[in-house]
C-alpha cells in the first residue's frame, strides 16, 4: 500500500494537520505536514491514542432492550370484540467470554498459591523441627561439658578419694551419653513425622484442586459444545425458568387440578372451556390456549445437503441453507469478498461458502440432461479409414467452382446467380484412387462466417489462386482460416493457360503470408491447374489423396451418427431442409436427430444430386428433411435414442439462447442510453430481409450491419429463410421498412398487402447489387453538407456619402462577379470585420444585378457605414453538397 502524507491523513480522519503532528510527537514520532506516514507508524499512533484514552479496555458487558407492541382482539360484553395493545419488553445482557475465562484463571492461580503456601509451611515445619533437635543436642553437650568440668574440679580438691570413685563416674557418663542419644533420636523422629504429615496434607490438597479443575473444565466444554449455548444467558434462563414455575404454581393454586391429575394448559378452565370473563373471573384476561411455544432450538448444528447449480444468487443460497442472507454476506466478508444480496455467485464460490458454514454440497449442471443424451451412444470403437473432406477456398472469381465443376463433370458455376457461389456446396467425388468429399465455399467478402465453417469441418484446404491476379484479400483470409484450424494447405494455381499467367509471382506473394512452396523448402504443395483445359487436375487429386494418406483419417463407421450442418434452408414444399456432413457413424432414415436448437426424425434423405438414399456414412454430405425448424449453419447434428429427451434438450437450448439474447439487448440498451441522448436522433433504415438459405442470410445481415454509421443505422427488424409472406409485408408497412428478398419471392397474399400499403419491395440474386443499393439508400438519408464558394472580390478605391444610403464604396471588381442577391463579407487586412448583404449595386448611376471582373461599381452595404479605402468586399454563395457513404 502506498504511504500517505501527514496532511492527507489528517484530511481523511477529519483533524487539523497541526494537531496530528502534535499527536505524532507525543507518541515519540517526529513528523512534519509533508512527511509520509507508513502503516507501522499509523499503528504505533493508534496504540498510543488507545492507551491515552483508555481504548484498550473494551466494554465487557452489553445490555439490549427490545420493545414490541402487538394487538390482541378480545371479546367484550354483548358479543362485541375490541382490540387492546400488548407491549412486550425484553432485556438481554451479553458478557464477553473473556470475563469467564479470567475468573477461571483467577481461581486456578488462587489454588496454585494455596498449594505453594502449603508446601512452604511443610518446609518451614521441617526446618523448625531440625533446629529444635539441634538446639537440644547442643544444650546436652554443654551440660556434659559442665559436668566434666565440675568433676575435674572436685577431683583436684579431693585428690585420692576421687581416684576411688572413677568406676562409678565412668558408668554415669555412659548412661548420660545413652540418654542423650535416645533424646536426639526421638526429636529427629518427631520432626520427620511432622514433615511427612505436612507433605501428605499438601499432596491431598493438590489432588483435590486438580480434580475440581478437571470437573470445571469438563463442564465448560460440555456447555460450549451444546448448540446455541451462551455464557451470558444461562443465568437468565435459569431465573426465567424459576419465575415461570412460580407463576404456574400460583395459577395452579387458584384453578385446582382435575381428578385425573392431568395438568391443564394455562388459560383453560375445568372441562376444557375457555375463560369467558364471567362473575368469578371478571377481571381475568382471555389467555391463549397454551403459553408454550411450538418451536424448540435444535440441540446441535443442522447439516443440510445444499444443491448448487452453475450460478446462484446470495438470496437463493441463503434460502437453500435456511439461514439469513446477512450470514452469507458476513461469511464472504471474512473470506475477503464484498457481495450484495442479489449478486450472482459462480458454482465454486458458492461451494466454498456452503462448506465453510458446515453444509454438504451437491453440485448440479443445468444441462445435465443434454450431457446424458449426448453421452448415451453406442460403445462401438472400431474405426475404419474414411474419405478426406476437402474445402476449396480462395478469392472471388478465381475459379474455385469451375475447378470443382471440371472435377464433377457438371455445370455448377453457370447455375449460380452472377456466376459466383453464394452457398456452401457439398459434393463427393469417386476417383480411381478413392473417394473425396469437396466443400465449395463463397469467395465474396460477405461470406467470412461460411468460410470459417468450411475450414472447421474440413481435413484439407485447397487454396485456389488465379495466376493472372495473384494474392487478394479473401486469399489471405482463407490462409488465416486454415492456420487457425490447423489444416494442411494445398495451393492450386489456376488459370495457368492464360498468356498473362505468372505462377512465380503467386509463389512470391504467398511466401509473404507464411505459405512456402516445397520447391523453396516449405511444406505446402503447389499444383498448376487449369479449370478450362483440365491441365493439372489429376496431379491435384493425387496430391489431395497423398496428403490424406499422411493424415491417416479414420472414423467409426457403424453406430449412431454425428456430423455438422453445412447449410440449411426453408423449402416451401418440403419444410426445413438441412445439409449435413456426416463425420462419424451412419445416418439412417428414421433416426432421431438433435441439431442445435432444433430436433426431429429423419423423414427423407437425399444426396447432392437430389437422389433419395436411406443411409450415409462418414464424410458423406446429405440433405435431411423432418426437423422442427431451420438449424443454424455450423450447428452440430447428433443422433439420439429418445425423441422426448431430444425435444427437452432443444427447448432448453432455445430458452438459454433467448435469455442470452435478451440479456445482450438489455446491456446494449443500457450502454447506449446516454450516447443516444447526447447524439440526438439517428436516421434508421428499416429492412425486412428474407433469403433462400441460412448461410446467405447470415452473410447479408452481417454486411448490412457493417454499413451502419453514426448518422444512419441499418435496422434489420425481421429476417428469415424462405419466401416473403403476408406477415412480413404487414410488418414492413407498420415499421416503414424496405422488403428485401434474396433469391426468394413474395406469395400472392403478400403481393396484395405490398400493393395496398405501397411497401418498397426489392428482389436480388447477387449480393453485390443488394449491398450497393442499400448503401445508396443510406446515402440519400444522410444530412447534406453546405459549402461556401467565393464568387467575386471587389477592392474599395474611394468612399462617397449618400444622403439616402450612407457610405457608398467605389470599388473595382478584381475577381469573379459581384451579385446583388448574394451575401458579402467586408475584409480589412484580410480579417473579416463585417458579414451581411448588399443594399445597393450601381454602375454609372444605374442599378444593376451583377458587375463582372475588371469593371467599376458603387456598393452600398446594408447597416454598415465604416467602409474605408483599401477594404475588400467578398461576395459568396452557399452550395449544398449531397453526401455519400
Swiss-Prot record:
It comes from the Bacteria. The keyword Oxidoreductase does not apply. Residues 494-497 are annotated as: G4. This is Translation initiation factor IF-2. HAMAP family: IF_2_B. It comes from Shewanella loihica (strain ATCC BAA-1088 / PV-4). Residues 419-423 are annotated as: G2. GO terms for molecular function: GTP binding; GTPase activity; guanosine tetraphosphate binding; translation initiation factor activity.
Amino acid at each position: 500500500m502506498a504511504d500517505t502524507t501527514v496532511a492527507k491523513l489528517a484530511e481523511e480522519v477529519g483533524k487539523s494537520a497541526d494537531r496530528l503532528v502534535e499527536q505524532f510527537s507525543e507518541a515519540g514520532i517526529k513528523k512534519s505536514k509533508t512527511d509520509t506516514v507508513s502503516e507501522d507508524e499509523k499503528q504505533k499512533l493508534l496504540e498510543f491514542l488507545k492507551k491515552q484514552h483508555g481504548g484498550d479496555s473494551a466494554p465487557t458487558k452489553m445490555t439490549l432492550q427490545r420493545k414490541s407492541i402487538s394487538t390482541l382482539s378480545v371479546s367484550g360484553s354483548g358479543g362485541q370484540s375490541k382490540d387492546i395493545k400488548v407491549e412486550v419488553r425484553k432485556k438481554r445482557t451479553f458478557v464477553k467470554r473473556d470475563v469467564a475465562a479470567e475468573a477461571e484463571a483467577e481461581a486456578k492461580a488462587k489454588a496454585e498459591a494455596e498449594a505453594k503456601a502449603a508446601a512452604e509451611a511443610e518446609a518451614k515445619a521441617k526446618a523448625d523441627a531440625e533446629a529444635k533437635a539441634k538446639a537440644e543436642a547442643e544444650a546436652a553437650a554443654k551440660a556434659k561439658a559442665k559436668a566434666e568440668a565440675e568433676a575435674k574440679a572436685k577431683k583436684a580438691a579431693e585428690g585420692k578419694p576421687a581416684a576411688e570413685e572413677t568406676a562409678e563416674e565412668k558408668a554415669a557418663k555412659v548412661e548420660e551419653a545413652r540418654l542423650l542419644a535416645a533424646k536426639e533420636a526421638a526429636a529427629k523422629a518427631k520432626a520427620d513425622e511432622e514433615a511427612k504429615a505436612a507433605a501428605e496434607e499438601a499432596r491431598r490438597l493438590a489432588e483435590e484442586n486438580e480434580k475440581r479443575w478437571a470437573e470445571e473444565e469438563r463442564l465448560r466444554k460440555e456447555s460450549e459444545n451444546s448448540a446455541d449455548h451462551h455464557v451470558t444467558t444461562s443465568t437468565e434462563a435459569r431465573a426465567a425458568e424459576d419465575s415461570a414455575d412460580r407463576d404456574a404454581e400460583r395459577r395452579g393454586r387458584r384453578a385446582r387440578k382435575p381428578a385425573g391429575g392431568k395438568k391443564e394448559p394455562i388459560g383453560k378452565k375445568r372441562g376444557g372451556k375457555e375463560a369467558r370473563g364471567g362473575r368469578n373471573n371478571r377481571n381475568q384476561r382471555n389467555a391463549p390456549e397454551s403459553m408454550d411455544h411450538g418451536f424448540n432450538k435444535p440441540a446441535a448444528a443442522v447439516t443440510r445437503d445444499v444443491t448448487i447449480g452453475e450460478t446462484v444468487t446470495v438470496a437463493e443460497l441463503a434460502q437453500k441453507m435456511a439461514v439469513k442472507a446477512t450470514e452469507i454476506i458476513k461469511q464472504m466478508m471474512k473470506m475477503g469478498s464484498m457481495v450484495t444480496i442479489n449478486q450472482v455467485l459462480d458454482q465454486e464460490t458458492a461451494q466454498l461458502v456452503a462448506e465453510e458454514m458446515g453444509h454438504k454440497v451437491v453440485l448440479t449442471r443445468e444441462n445435465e440432461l443434454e450431457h446424458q443424451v449426448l453421452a448415451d451412444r453406442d460403445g462401438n470403437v472400431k474405426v475404419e479409414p474414411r474419405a478426406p473432406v476437402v474445402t476449396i477456398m480462395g478469392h472471388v472469381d478465381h475459379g474455385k467452382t469451375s475447378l470443382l465443376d471440371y472435377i464433377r463433370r457438371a455445370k455448377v458455376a453457370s447455375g449460380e446467380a452472377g456466376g459466383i457461389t453464394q452457398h456452401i456446396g457439398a459434393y463427393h467425388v469417386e476417383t480411381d484412387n478413392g473417394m473425396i468429399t469437396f466443400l465449395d465455399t463463397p469467395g465474396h467478402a460477405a461470406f467470412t462466417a461460411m468460410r470459417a465453417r468450411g475450414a472447421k469441418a474440413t481435413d484439407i484446404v485447397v487454396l485456389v489462386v488465379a495466376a493472372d491476379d495473384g494474392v487478394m484479400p479473401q486469399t489471405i483470409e482463407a490462409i488465416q482460416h486454415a492456420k487457425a484450424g490447423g489444416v494442411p494447405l494445398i495451393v492450386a494455381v489456376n488459370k495457368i493457360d492464360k498468356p498473362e499467367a505468372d505462377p512465380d509471382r503467386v509463389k512470391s506473394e504467398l511466401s509473404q503470408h507464411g505459405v512456402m512452396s516445397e520447391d523453396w523448402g516449405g511444406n505446402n504443395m503447389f499444383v498448376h491447374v487449369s479449370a478450362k483445359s483440365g491441365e493439372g487436375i489429376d496431379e491435384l487429386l493425387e496430391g489431395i489423396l497423398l496428403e490424406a494418406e499422411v493424415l491417416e483419417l479414420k472414423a467409426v463407421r457403424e453406430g449412431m451418427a454425428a456430423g455438422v450442418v453445412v447449410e440449411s434452408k426453408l423449402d416451401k414444399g418440403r419444410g426445413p431442409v438441412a445439409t449435413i456432413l456426416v463425420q462419424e457413424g451412419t445416418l439412417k432414415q428414421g433416426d432421431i436427430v438433435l441439431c442445435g436448437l432444433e430436433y426431429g426424425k429423419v423423414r427423407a434423405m437425399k444426396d447432392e444430386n437430389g437422389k433419395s438414399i436411406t443411409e450415409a456414412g462418414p464424410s458423406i454430405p446429405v440433405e435431411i428433411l423432418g426437423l422442427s425448424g431451420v438449424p443454424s449453419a455450423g450447428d452440430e447434428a447428433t443422433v439420439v435414442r429418445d425423441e422426448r429427451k431430444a425435444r427437452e434438450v432443444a427447448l432448453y437450448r432455445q430458452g438459454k439462447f433467448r435469455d442470452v439474447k435478451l440479456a445482450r439487448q438489455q446491456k446494449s440498451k443500457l450502454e447506449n442510453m446516454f450516447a443516444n441522448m447526447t447524439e440526438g436522433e439517428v436516421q434508421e433504415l428499416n429492412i425486412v430481409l428474407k433469403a433462400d438459405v441460412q448461410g446467405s442470410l447470415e452473410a447479408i445481415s452481417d454486411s448490412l450491419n457493417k454499413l451502419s454509421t453514426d448518422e444512419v443505422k441499418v435496422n434489420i427488424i425481421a429476417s428469415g429463410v424462405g419466401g416473403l409472406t403476408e406477415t412480413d409485408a404487414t410488418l414492413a408497412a407498420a415499421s416503414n421498412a424496405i422488403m428485401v428478398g434474396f433469391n426468394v419471392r413474395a406469395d400472392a397474399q403478400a403481393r396484395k398487402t405490398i400493393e395496398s400499403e405501397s411497401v418498397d419491395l426489392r428482389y436480388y440474386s447477387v449480393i453485390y447489387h443488394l449491398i450497393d443499393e442499400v448503401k445508396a439508400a443510406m446515402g440519400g438519408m444522410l444530412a447534406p453538407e453546405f459549402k461556401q464558394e467565393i464568387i467575386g472580390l471587389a477592392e474599395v478605391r474611394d468612399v462617397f456619402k449618400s444622403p439616402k444610403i450612407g457610405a457608398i464604396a467605389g470599388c473595382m471588381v478584381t475577381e469573379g462577379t459581384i451579385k446583388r442577391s448574394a451575401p458579402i463579407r467586408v475584409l480589412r487586412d484580410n480579417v473579416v470585420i463585417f458579414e451581411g448583404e448588399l443594399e445597393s449595386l450601381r454602375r454609372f448611376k444605374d442599378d444593376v444585378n451583377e458587375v463582372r471582373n475588371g469593371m467599376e461599381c458603387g456598393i452600398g452595404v446594408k447597416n454598415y457605414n465604416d467602409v474605408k479605402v483599401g477594404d475588400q468586399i467578398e461576395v459568396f454563395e452557399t452550395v449544398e453538397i449531397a453526401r455519400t457513404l
